[in-house]
Amino acid sequence: MSSDLAAPDLAAAADVIDLAGGVVGKGVRHLAANGGPDVHQLLAYDLAHAAAQVETARALLDYGAKGAQEAAIACAFTADMVHDLITRIAGREASWGIEIAPLKAAHPFLQQFRSPEFVASLAQQAGPRHLDGEMEMVIDGVAGRYG
């Protein structure tokens, strides 16, 4: 990674994930209190996707703790997750039962870890998989057959 790029910041990523999780939690409570998924199917769909993305980002924090490259991947995914959540809620805040721009505190993180330069830096080397030898053989076999 170039020295002028932002250094991965897992503590900031965790804060952004918690912020996003809080927004999703408010949306879930609002959905439950207002007729549920049968009445608000689009909201339920958006919440399901958002919750999955938030929890995937949370799981990536452990991966990110394994090294600098892994941390960069975790930060980029977290930035992409929160960007997607912002686009899901923009203009639909009332449907979610939330205030306007509830993720504005995440914008500095987005600027750092969603920048084209930062994202492009991830393509220079594949992230380590951290698999045991047996699973690496499975991957090699599948790649040899289909890759």
Where are these regions (language model features)?
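Flavin-dependent oxidoreductase catalytic core characteristic
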Residues: 1-147
